[in-house]
Structure formats: C-alpha cells, structure tokens
Amino acid sequence: MEFSLSEEQKLIIDTTKKFVESELFPHEELVEKTGNLPMDLIKEIQAKAIKTGIYAANIPQEFGGGGLDTLTWLLYEKELGKANYALHWTCVARPSNILCAGTKDQKEKYLKPCIEGKKWDCLAMTEPNAGSDLRGMTASARETTSGDWVLNGTKHFISHADIADFTIAFMASGIEETNKGPKKLITAFFVDKGTPGFNVREGYDNVSHRGYTNSILEFSDVKVPKESILGEVHKGFEVANKWLGATRLQVGATCLGRAERAFNHAIEWAATRQQFGQSIGKFQGTSFKLSDMAMELKAAQLLILEAGWKYDQGTATDLDMAMAKLKASEMLAMVSDEAIQIHGGMGLMTELPLERIWRDARLERIWEGTSEIQRHIISRSLLRPYEN
C-alpha cells in the first residue's frame, strides 16, 4: 500500500485546510449559539468553495467535478471535518447515489445542477420505526396501470430536506418470497420539491451537528412517473449499498479531523497549563492520556487510509469499510472526552471547540450504520468462510 502524496495532492489538502480556517472557523460561534445556518451564509460559503476549486472535488471530472481519488478525498474530508458539520456540508457536493445508479437524463437533470451548486439534494431512508433495518420500512410505492407510481408514508431525520430541491426517497415496493420467508423489496425515487402530496415538516432539536437541519417528510398519494426511479424497480437496497461504503469512509475521515483538532488543543493545553509548579503534561495521569489518544488516532487513520487505498484499487470490502468507520467514530468519542478531561472545567466552556466536538462525536456512532451494525458486519465477514 502506498499512502504518499504527490505535490498536487498536497496542494489540494493545504488549500482545503486554509479554506476551513479562513472561511468556516469564523462562523462556528454563530451556528453553535443560534443552531441556525442562514441561507445567505450557505450561498456565500458555497460560492467561495466553488471559486477556490474545492466544491465537488470528490465528483469525477467527466461530470464537472474535481476527480479526486478516494485517498485524497478522505484527507480532504478530514480537513473539512475539523469545522462545525453544517459549515462543512456547504463545501461539498454529495450526490454519489446518482453517480452510482442514475441514467444519463437523471444525471443531467439532478446531478449536474448539484455539482454546479445550483441545486441541493437530500436522501430519505429512515422512518420512525425503521432505522438500521432498511427492509423494515413501511413507506410504500404502488405502481399504477399507467406505469406511474404512488408514494405514501413518512420519513424522518432527513438531513437538510428543508432546503433541498429534490429528494431521493426509498420506498417499500413489493414482497419477494425466499427460502427464509417473505423479503421486502425497495425502490428509490426522485421526488421534486413542490410535488403535490409531498410535504416537508420541521424535524427535531438535537445536541449534535447544530445548524445541520433534519426534517420530517410526508408522502400522501404522491404521484411520480416511472422515469423518476433511481436504478431498477425493487433494487433500491442495491442502490443504497453501492454508495453506503464510501459514505462510511467519509464519516470516518470527518471523525479523524475532529479528533485531530481536539488532540492538538489537548497537547497545547498540557504543555502550557501550569499546576503545582509545572506543566500538567509532566504528570503521568495527563501524559498517559496523550499517549493513548495519539495511538488511537494513528490506528484509526491507518484503517481509513487503507480502506481508501483499497477502494481505489477496487478491492475494498464491507469489512474494510465497517472497521474503518467503527474505529474512527469510537476513537473520536474517546479522544474528545479525554481532551475535555485534560482541560478540566475549561474543556466544557463554549469558548473552545471541545464541547462541540464531544457532542458531535455521539452522533457518529449512530448514523450511517450504528456501531452495533458495524460489529455485525465485521463478525459476519469473519465467520462467513466457516458457514455451510
């Protein structure tokens, strides 16, 4: 495996790092205190990201993006991940599901405007009674005699649906009989904002990712044409799986960035904070914490980089993605907690980013596949060779 970077790759990472420090960090206090990211600020940051060349850097060049390889993309995401997530999100186009399964017309209608910063997308899978269990969803799609589809049901926890121009909604579309019993079939649909019967309601307040909104989506006899299907009929589960692995790596890379920021604060504080006549970094209780934090950070980074390298080689597996996401998200929880402990009471003050990183860390072990789901994937992969 080769993790060394070319001068061009280093320039991309350095440009992203400087952009985060100059354009994102200054707005963190506003977003954290108000829980709101104003639309004019979103557009301002997005325009600067496009001008700088970092917006849509993860999208292939043939579609107008930057064409980053996976390894560089993850390091780019790591730098963006150091900022408040709502601000981070304004800098990246993420319609990878359309890349994976969209038709030429769908890419022209939906993908291209997203890459150009003219449209926003959102993804609707989670339901009040269907989180990790995608096949447990009850929101439904029914085909009519004319070939159109009618959608009904509710989705929730849908990120930035309040400003999205269209939604990719995953719906239960049929039942297949298998040796293990009935299996629910899923189909993905494009649903444009303003479609009759499609309603977006305000979601929930939460402790993580302030400013990064979530919404409740209601579908009441929403009629969409067959051309709105993303991928194939009843193949929505496959559509989701095509991009979910890369998304988990992105989450892991974001965790690396946050952990690195918290760790750097902890090192500086330990080296300069004086107690009992010496810096607290000289006390074994503090120095051992720093040692453990450094080791966990390095281990998570190596798993992320290895998975990214293998992804570019076409050899990455579900096991690689699960281990990387699990390790990085749990490492962030540990590092952010210990960084606060090293700072003492000051670590809980909003003048520092530590309490925000600590709050945000809690979400990373839940979304894009809980830690329990990742462990299930890992153990299943290990035991599969011994199954009859």
Regions found by a protein language model. Give the residues of each.
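Short Gly/Pro-enriched turn/cap motifs at secondary-structure boundaries
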Residues: 89, 114, 129-132, 157-160, ...
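Alpha-helical interface subdomain recognition
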Residues: 1-89, 101-106, 113-118, 131-134, ...
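Flexible, glycine-rich active-site loops centered on histidine and acidic residues
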Residues: 96-101, 123-124, 135, 176
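A structural signal for short hydrophobic beta-strand segments in well-ordered beta-sheet cores
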Residues: 139-142
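Flexible, small-/acidic-enriched active-site or ligand-binding loops
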Residues: 136, 194-223
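Short Ser/Thr-interspersed hydrophobic loop/turn segments at strand-loop and sheet-helix junctions
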Residues: 53, 76-81, 171-172, 191-196, ...
